[in-house]
Amino acid sequence: MNPNQKIITIGSICMVIGIVSLMLQIGNMISIWVSHSIQTGNQHQAEPISNTNFLTEKAVASVTLAGNSSLCPISGWAVHSKDNSIRIGSKGDVFVIREPFISCSHLECRTFFLTQGALLNDKHSNGTVKDRSPHRTLMSCPVGEAPSPYNSRFESVAWSASACHDGTSWLTIGISGPDNGAVAVLKYNGIITDTIKSWRNNILRTQESECACVNGSCFTVMTDGPSNGQASYKIFKMEKGKVVKSVELDAPNYHYEECSCYPDAGEITCVCRDNWHGSNRPWVSFNQNLEYQIGYICSGVFGDNPRPNDGTGSCGPVSPNGAYGVKGFSFKYGNGVWIGRTKSTNSRSGFEMIWDPNGWTGTDSSFSVKQDIVAITDWSGYSGSFVQHPELTGLDCIRPCFWVELIRGRPKESTIWTSGSSISFCGVNSDTVGWSWPDGAELPFTIDK
């Protein structure tokens, strides 16, 4: 075979290979196109089913938290959560916080908290003992988790706050601004729906615990005025994040701050802090039309801090050691009352739950149950109530629960910061145990040295 024949033969072979390759590519493209067309057709056919499923899930997820049931009968308190945020924050990214509280929807419980716009063990944690600053925000995370930038959801700019779920969406109330003109911003499902302006221009403030919802309406209590004298107190009724009614309490010689509110048989009961002159706790109860009654817990087992030793109570303010105070709570059961309080009478340390079977109306100091929560040698702080509705628990009653803030740092410890972790308990009618569940962090941190 001469050179020309070789060239022709090689060229012919290459041409045949090229044609075969081209045909294979065309066949492959046709196959891909047909396959894609079939898949697209299947997707188009499935879309109505997908939309139907989505709408069905939303319908199931949206309920009305009735709040018409009574509180569950209980014999003690079972531990529900502990976030250990200060211990974890010595090494991890954890927010500097105060005023944590818990609230539950019909699907989940979340911890809400007021951040300081800073992380533990960081330079911006310096000076965070201050209550009110433009850097404070209300955020939330799943209950029991340490609040960090990775698991937390922004809710509102706030140095005083409340939040609750009506069965459809979260309502948040965040107060921010100057002391002489603060404004409460109401959000429903994350959207601003209303505002409330300070009416006395003297540190408008609210609960620092959950608001209470009944039959689609939610209720909160706010204070405006002196922290050491007669102030003004209002109850607000909200629907889908908008104020629909409010009433100012006619309460001379009463002092209400940082109320802990809960629904019970279709009405709302709030147990509050008297920072003026009471070492027992004031209460206000009201129906859905905001018709209210007021009083003080009569028991000689006093619930505030500081307070005198237990003795003879009063259905008005008990004056000895009555000035100042700490946020707290109680649960009313007929004439009886579960009282949560610090173990110490003069510092925010220790915590215990006491059942006084006659304490709502009786003035003696006898009680029948005491359950230890935090030892007197460990720091506690604010405490407050929350509830779990039957729509969450499957019970036929409203389960009472409470949380305790475990404050660490300034002003009692040698740090540059103030923050806290939290624990929570829920009422049960079965076996429980008393113990101590302290914060447990070893201080100071690296930033403090």
Curated annotation (Swiss-Prot):
Residues 11-33 are annotated as: Involved in apical transport and lipid raft association. Residues 28-449 are virion surface. CDD domains: Influenza_NA (cd15483). It catalyses: Hydrolysis of alpha-(2->3)-, alpha-(2->6)-, alpha-(2->8)- glycosidic linkages of terminal sialic acid residues in oligosaccharides, glycoproteins, glycolipids, colominic acid and synthetic substrates. It is an enzyme of class 3 (hydrolase). Disulfide bonds join 72-397, 104-109, 164-211, 213-218, 259-272, 261-270, 298-315, 401-426. Belongs to the glycosyl hydrolase 34 family. HAMAP family: INFV_NRAM (MF_04071). Intact N-terminus is essential for virion morphogenesis. Possesses two apical sorting signals, one in the ectodomain, which is likely to be a glycan, and the other in the transmembrane domain. The transmembrane domain also plays a role in lipid raft association. This is Neuraminidase. The lineage of its organism: Viruses, Riboviria, Orthornavirae, Negarnaviricota, Polyploviricotina.
